[in-house]
Curated annotation (Swiss-Prot):
The gene is FH6. GO terms for molecular function: phosphoprotein phosphatase activity. It comes from the Eukaryota. Keywords: Hydrolase, Protein phosphatase. This is Formin-like protein 6. Belongs to the formin-like family. Class-II subfamily. Residues 1317-1351 have a biased composition (Basic and acidic residues). It comes from Oryza sativa subsp. japonica (Rice).
Length: 1364
């Protein structure tokens, strides 16, 4: 069908651009030129005349996007041609969009008109300045009709039809993000049962800006907000108005810098409904000049989860302002249901006085202990003044009402179009409420300060001035003239509004009227002359124009005046017969230069001229690259190898005796040579091959070589032009062993490469065989396409090389030796130098490296049939040349020994000496060890000086290692079971036929192995796995398994590789079959990500909800703790006692970080701090406050929560829901394969949205509580966020508890010390008491002794003598 459309395609008339089938656009929409009335009428008339000749039986409808209430000039002109004209507004509050109702009306009208008859044609037109909305509506129509997929791609395709500078001229802001948002609304219309859904009345609570943009030159901004839309409190009025505007003169409109705060939170509390335009404007330092930060247009019916999260790519910004926004910029707009909006109570900062705390007199001793100690920061004077202001009775109230801006016209700066406020703004805006981060009352007298006078004026569109028009045209004049060359003129009015009436004499068909009534609903016509209109008056905003003028930013383009406009709809009834009767064959000479319109097909009408490339035939379906990549030798390496081989050839006179070929002969022979062997579809460009690595992988295991026959079929060896030398020494050269990278037991498959066109091959040249001197030749070989049916006995063992004679000079050199016979040994023709290899008796010629040949390696050849007369063993012809056994792969090379040509006499050629010889010998050694088990060591490639390995390389007999018995090694460490040679030859055929073919790997081997490991963990058949994915069954697959599946979804390159595979899919590897199965599902990667989100959604929501509850609990506990409040008041009294009589004294409050300075202020004896003293005083006088940490149970957990991370989690949940919704919409085009998937996903989405909506409400409440906590301590939420408040309190609590414990320990020590001292004193007094107790006994004894002595003295002398 596409071919028929191409043959029967008719170029559209001049002046029209075809967008898709039967949809055209006037080319005047792509220019800013202005026509006068006469020229414009001639321009339209010429196009209409061509249309009627081009589409003789067609009916036409014109959609016009214009401004104004009266009928447009286009409708007035086309009414005389019996064309239906429908007028739409070209903007909505300065944004090049229309309301969702207008979009729905346009889409239904366009779709119904085009589907009503195949002869109906739709034409789009816009007046000057309406190209942006016209492009959006065209993209919406294409998406609505499912002619294109992808919102951004479709919109960009439409914009490319006009010069790039046109949209930048017409719109100072980039409108594409908001337009894409509305295109999402259109493309996802099938998610909900009714589209468009009913307008939701919401309350816009606040706007949070994260990672502040820089708009003041100092890395910050001074933001204010304006909101435009329909007032939900006035159900009867659909007129948009200013719903909210931040007063400029408010003292809370201040500068926010990146270094001071990470986010800005602006409380708004404005009621909205339907289509809303939100503008964020940055004020200059003088609060007069305005600069647009961003603009967002959205519809409340499509707000999910009561939150709108935007990054810098999803907001309308100035064309050159993207660098002002950090990459991490986020704007969060939080909503709540209008009926359940909770008014925030006025928060008192708290009576931070001395009523409930200890009086100053209680700290009389502290002045002596902490005298002359600076415990406060010297810069804290400003903090004291701030607290005095914040605790005043006027400022602790949070909100009173919103100021109503006065109704005046004033223009924004050069970056914002103008708006007009409606008449009843003052009456309606009183219902909305304004608050910044900590919103306070505003007085009504601030209204006058909100509306300054104009500093400069911009010519209005209706003023008739053409100065601005000339400046606009001068910017894109060169580009516009390439599109159309029309003599421009100036109109006195840019808004072309002329009353339009339809021809009353035009007949009306009743049957068409009944059809169109059903299609167009409200567009019913009771009379042919009746014009149905709908009022769309648009209000203007209030702004100020800066004195500077920037033509690029279109300061001349005012904020599209949206005065009440009418949707003038001329009757939609068309009589096809009337068009046939009124056709006039009039020749009109067009005064307009014809514009070639772009041709297109029905499905993709808009085409871009492709880049002219060389005509290249498509290459044949070759096997895709397998593994691994062989490095391509450079040109220097190839030249050096050529020189080495030339020197080797000079050493052998028998090689240099051959006659040389002239360059012309070489070129001819080379071309003939390649054309003889390769078919046309196998020709490749060597220049392309040298730039692309050749990927090689082993082929299936080949069968062993049959016994050679005496007669064989020889084929010409294709020599590439790059490898041809000027002499035959390059052709007849000793073959070298194959390099190690190419050691393969079978013929590898080459990856398809890009080809260039080459002429078809001529017939193969006939060449007589070269006769050599020697014994008579054997019988001539059969035809090249034949092969012996039975094998012959092997030839006798070859004699030594020294006994052979050098071959004589050939009679006539031939570029392609088809048949040769000789009895003396002849050296085979080697491949080009980059691919030096020895032609083995059991393997064909090894593959050629890229760059060395212009053709891929031939397919697996038939079993070689060799004889003694063969000069070389070239590779057999491709499959098209072979008839028998052409698909049998060659056998592997035998382990050990030099490879020789089949049937050759004498020893094989010795490999060249030097480094190349060593490397080649090592490659041969590696091939000999291929049947042994590998030793997995870490190889050292370069011996360090003085190391053991350097010494081992010396030729010292003592250092030489012993010679190992290879047979013993093979017997002990063989990788495969050994088998006798006799049995091998006998059972070769049966083993080849019975062996299981190896798996073919198209994917990178490492990735394939990892994929196989992953599949072993899944442990289920692939069909069951696909079924689990489509049913989103989380009982079968868990999150880890789905994550692994996402990692192993095929990439775009892998998918293309697998699609190009045409062989048997059963022989593919496990990874390839898994990828094949995944590719059966459309957008399997997106489905798996949706599946993963569904599995993780409950845990994500529960974790986020738990964290939010912790923040709420901690904020409520801190604000509700009476003990903490009394302690704060006690600290205030303590500080005032210390600072009494100084500038820091008599404070009404203190900054929150001053709490930590209590531990830094030490007494003069350095034995205690103020924190210890505070604990001591509270223990003595207010002991009931010591357990205040028990009131802050959630403080520890709250200190671990970051509000930024909570915002990121909330954003991830919302983005995940958007992806779910997008996949649900896209999967409707998948067909029955995704039917269960859609049903399951729709059920999940309905429940998830309700849960996320409640989570968003909690998230918004947490944000308010976090800000209220900072305000509770008199802090600015922007400078002292919730995290800082909580961490400061946590550290204070820890320091207080530690100080209290230390005080308790110190008190215990003092008690013990006092006890010890008392005991010591008591012990000291006991000896004295004991001594005092002993002294009375001694006196008595002395008294007794004295009495005894007295008695003795009183005795008589006689008694004394008798006693002696």
């Amino acid at each position: 069908m596409a071919l028929f459309r191409k043959f029967f395609y008719r170029k559209p008339p001049d002046g029209l651009l075809e967008i898709t089938e039967r949809v055209y656009v006037f080319d005047s929409c792509f220019t800013t030129d202005v026509f006068n009335d006469d020229k414009y009428q001639d321009y339209i008339g010429d196009i209409v005349a061509q249309l009627q000749c081009h589409f003789a039986d067609a009916s036409f409808m014109v959609f016009n996007f214009r401004e104004g209430e009266s009928q447009s000039l286009l409708a007035n002109i086309l009414s005389s041609y019996e064309m239906v004209v429908m007028d739409y507004p070209r903007q909505y509050e300065g944004c090049p969009l229309v309301t969702i109702e207008m979009i729905h009306h346009f889409l239904r009208s366009g779709e119904s008109w085009l589907s009503l008859s195949q002869q109906n044609v739709l034409i789009m037109h816009c007046e000057r300045g309406g190209w942006a909305v016209l492009a959006f509506m065209l993209a919406g129509l294409l998406l609505y009709r499912k002619q294109y997929i992808g919102e951004q791609r479709t919109l960009e395709m439409i914009y490319r039809q006009a010069p790039r500078e046109l949209i930048q001229l017409l719109s100072p802001l980039n409108p594409i993000p908001s337009q894409i948002r509305y295109l999402h609304y259109i493309s996802r219309r099938n998610v909900s049962a009714v589209w468009p859904p009913g307008d939701r009345a919401l309350t816009l609570d606040c706007v949070i800006l994260r990672n502040i943009p820089g708009f003041n030159g100092e890395g910050g901004c001074r933001p204010i907000f304006r909101i435009y839309g329909k007032d939900p409190l006035l159900a009867t009025s659909n007129t948009p108005k200013v719903l909210f505007s931040t007063p400029k003169r408010s003292k809370y409109v201040r500068l926010y810098k990146k270094v001071d705060c990470e986010l800005i939170k602006i409380d708004i509390h404005c009621h909205i409904q339907g289509d809303v335009v939100l503008e964020c404007i940055s004020l200059d330092a003088d609060q007069q000049r305005e600069e647009m930060i961003f603009r967002v247009m959205f519809n409340t019916a499509f707000i999910r989860s009561n939150i709108l999260m935007l990054n810098r790519d999803e907001i309308d910004i100035l064309w050159d302002a993207k660098d002002r926004f950090p990459k991490e910029f986020r704007a969060e707009v939080l909503f709540s249901e209008m009926d359940s909006v909770n008014q925030l109570d006025s928060m008192e900062v708290g009576g931070i006085g001395e009523k409930e705390g200890l009086p100053v007199e209680a700290f009389a001793k502290v002045q002596e202990m902490f005298s002359n100690v600076d415990w406060l920061d010297p810069t804290a004077d400003a903090a004291a003044l701030l607290f005095q202001q914040l605790t005043s009775s006027e400022n602790i109230q949070l909100r009173k009402g919103l100021l109503s801006p006065n109704k005046k016209d004033f223009h924004l700066s050069s970056i914002s179009p103008t708006k007009k406020q409606s008449d009843n703004v003052e009456d309606k805006l009183s219902n909305a409420e304004l608050s910044t981060i900590y919103v306070h009352k505003q007085e009504n007298n601030d209204v006058q300060g909100l509306i300054p006078q104009k500093q400069a004026t911009i010519p209005d569109e209706k003023s008739g001035s053409s100065v601005i028009h000339e400046k606009m045209i001068s910017l894109v004049h060169e580009e516009i003239t390439q599109v159309v060359d029309i003599n421009t003129g100036c109109l006195s009015s840019l808004d072309m509004t002329v009353p339009s009436t339809m021809n009353s004499s035009r007949p009306v068909l009743i049957d068409q009227n009944s059809k169109l009534d059903d299609q167009f609903g409200s567009l019913q016509s009771s009379s042919p002359t009746m014009i149905m209109s709908q009022q769309f008056p648009v209000s203007r905003s209030s702004s100020v124009l800066s004195s500077d003028f920037s033509p690029r930013l279109l300061s001349a383009c005012p904020r599209f005046h949206s005065a009440p406009s009418a949707l003038g709809i001329t009757a939609l009834l068309e009589d096809h017969a009337a068009f046939g009767d009124t056709k006039n064959s009039v020749k009109v000479s067009s005064a307009v230069v014809k514009i070639p319109s772009k041709q297109s097909s029905q499905q993709h009408p808009i085409t871009v001229t492709p880049v002219v490339t060389k005509c290249t035939p498509s290459p044949p379906p070759l096997l895709p690259p397998l593994a691994p990549v062989v490095p391509v030798p450079s040109d220097d390496q190839m030249i050096s190898q050529e020189k080495d081989m030339s020197q080797q050839a000079q050493k052998h006179p028998d090689l240099s005796s051959f006659p040389s070929l002239s360059p012309t002969q070489q070129k001819q022979s080379t071309s003939k040579l390649c054309q003889t062997i390769l078919p046309t579809n196998h020709q490749l460009s060597s220049s392309n091959i040298t730039k692309e690595p050749l990927q090689i992988s082993p082929a299936p295991t080949p069968p062993p070589l049959p016994t050679p026959s005496t007669s064989s079929s020889s084929s010409c060896h294709c020599l590439p032009p790059d490898s041809m030398l000027s002499t035959t020494t390059a052709l007849f050269r000793p073959p070298a062993p194959p390099p190690p990278p190419l050691q393969s037991p079978s013929t590898p498959r080459c990856s398809p490469v890009r080809t260039l066109a080459s002429p078809p091959p001529p017939p193969a040249p006939t060449s007589s065989p070269v006769r050599m001197s020697g014994p008579p030749p054997p019988p001539p070989p059969p035809a090249p396409n034949s092969c012996p049916s039975r094998p012959a006995p092997p030839p006798p063992p070859p004699p030594p090389l020294a006994s052979t004679s050098s071959p004589p000079r050939p009679a006539a050199p031939s570029p392609c030796q088809l048949h040769t016979s000789t009895s003396s040994p002849a050296r085979p023709v080697p491949p080009p130098p980059p691919t030096l290899s020895t032609i083995r008796s059991s393997a064909p010629t090894p593959p050629l490296l890229p760059g060395a040949t212009s053709a891929p390696s031939p397919p697996p050849p038939p079993p070689p049939c060799s004889s003694s007369n063969q000069l070389s063993a070239p590779p057999p012809p491709p499959p098209s040349f072979s008839k028998n056994n052409g698909s049998i792969a060659p056998p592997p090379a035998p382990p050990g020994g030099n490879a020789k040509l089949p049937g050759m006499r004498g020893r094989g050629p010795a490999p060249p000496s030097g480094p190349m010889s060593r490397s080649l010998q090592s490659g041969q050694a590696a091939s000999r060890r291929s049947n042994l088990k590998p030793l997995h060591w870490v190889k050292v490639t370069r011996a360090m000086q003085g190391s053991l390995w350097e010494e081992s390389q010396k030729t010292d007999e003592a250092s030489k290692p012993p010679v190992f018995d290879m047979s013993e090694l093979e017997h002990l460490f063989s990788a495969v079971l050994p088998s006798s040679d006799g049995k091998r030859s006998d059972k070769s055929g049966s083993r080849a036929s019975g062996s299981k073919p190896e798996k073919i790997h198209l994917i990178d081997l490492r990735r394939a192995n990892n994929c196989g490991i992953m599949l072993t963990k899944v442990k289920m058949p692939l069909p069951d796995l696909m079924s689990a994915i489509l049913t989103l069954d989380d009982t079968i697959l868990d999150a880890d398994q789905v994550e692994n599946l996402i990692k192993f979804t095929p990439t775009k390159e892998e998918a293309e590789l697998l699609k190009g595979y045409k062989g048997d899919k059963q022989v593919l590897g496990e990874c390839e079959q898994f990828f094949m199965e995944l590719m059966k599902l459309p957008r399997v990667d997106s489905k798996l990500r949706v599946f993963l989100f569904k599995i993780q959604f409950p845990s994500q929501v529960s974790d986020l909800k738990r964290s939010l509850n912790i923040v709420n609990s901690s904020a409520e506990e801190i604000r509700g703790s009476a003990k903490l409040k009394r302690i704060m008041q006690t600290i205030l009294s303590l500080g005032n006692a210390l600072n009494q009589g100084t500038a820091r004294g008599s404070a009404v409050g203190f900054r929150l970080d001053s709490l930590l300075k209590l531990s830094d202020t030490r007494a003069r004896n350095n034995k205690m701090t103020l924190m210890h003293y505070l604990s001591k005083v509270l223990s003595e006088k207010l002991p009931e406050l010591l357990d205040f940490p028990k009131d802050l149970a959630s403080l520890e957990l709250a200190a671990k929560v970051q509000l930024k991370s909570l915002a990121e989690e909330m954003q991830a949940i919302n983005k995940g829901l958007e992806k779910v919704e997008q996949e649900l919409t896209t999967s409707e085009n998948d067909g029955p394969v995704s039917e269960i998937f859609r049903k399951t996903l729709k059920d999940f989405l309905s429940g998830a949205e309700a849960e996320v909506r409640s989570l968003t409400s909690l998230y918004s409440n947490v944000g308010r509580n976090a800000d209220a906590l900072a305000l509770y301590f008199g802090e600015d939420p922007a400078r002292c966020p919730f995290e800082q408040v909580v961490i400061t309190l946590q550290n204070f609590v820890r320091l207080f508890v530690r100080s209290h414990d230390e005080n308790c320990k110190q008190l215990d020590l003092e008690k013990k010390k006092a006890l010890k001292e008392a005991e010591a004193e008591k012990t000291k007094k006991e000896p004295e008491n004991a001594q005092k107790t002993k002294e009375p006994g001694n006196d008595k004894a002395k008294h007794n002794n004295s009495i005894k002595e007295l008695d003795i003295s009183l005795q008589s002398p006689a008694q004394t003598a008798s006693a002696k």
